[in-house]
Amino acid sequence: HAQIPTQCLEIERILVDACIDQAACPGATEGQNEMVSFRTGPQVTALTDLVADWPNNSWNGLVQDGTTATLTSILNATITACGLLVEPPGGLIPPGSRVLLVTSTAMCTQANPFTNLTDTIYLIFQAPGNISGHFANHNNGGTISPVPTGASALRTLVLMYLPTNCSDTA
């Protein structure tokens, strides 16, 4: 396990260009299936204390409800290793936790299995509404390809912890 960040949070990875096969998930879009992995700092983090400044979309806020519980259950059923996805109890994420922020509750679970997960990850969801990609990483047009075909378009994500105005940028 990595050390607990000394600051409020630390962005670790971003899954961008999350184009989904329409045959597997009719109606699914890139903006519904992108994800950001981060680790919380030394404080307990409430869902209401987090805000993302997406480079290419508006922030819709985080949601934890029956829909997110169902999604978490479906995704947990794909795990064949000893990992576990959990929603934050009472909307509170413990210090030093690995967190995965999914950009929509309209995600395509069939296209996002967690088969080989071997760790515990707190799973949180942005409220639905954004369908275009959050990062606008490449100009691929309508082309789905294993490598980007368009020109690079650098963007930055800022994830903020409101109580202390602390943030991380990736």
Model-predicted regions and their roles:
Residues 11-13, 31-35, 47-49, 88-90, ...:
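Extracellular structured ligand-interaction cores
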Residues 56-68:
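Short aromatic-acidic-glycine turn motif
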Residues 47-57, 121-170:
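Conserved beta-structured recognition patch
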Residues 2-3, 77, 103, 161:
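Disulfide-bonded cysteine motifs in exported proteins
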Residues 7-9, 18-20, 24-26, 81-83, ...:
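Sequence contexts marking disulfide-bonded cysteines in secreted/extracellular proteins
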Residues 104-130:
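Short, Lys/Arg- and Gly-enriched loop/turn segments at beta-strand edges
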Residues 69-109:
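Intrinsically disordered, low-complexity Pro/Gly/Ser/Thr-rich segments with frequent PxxP/GP/PP motifs
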Residues 2-58:
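A structural motif detector for short, solvent-exposed N-terminal "entry" segments of globular domains
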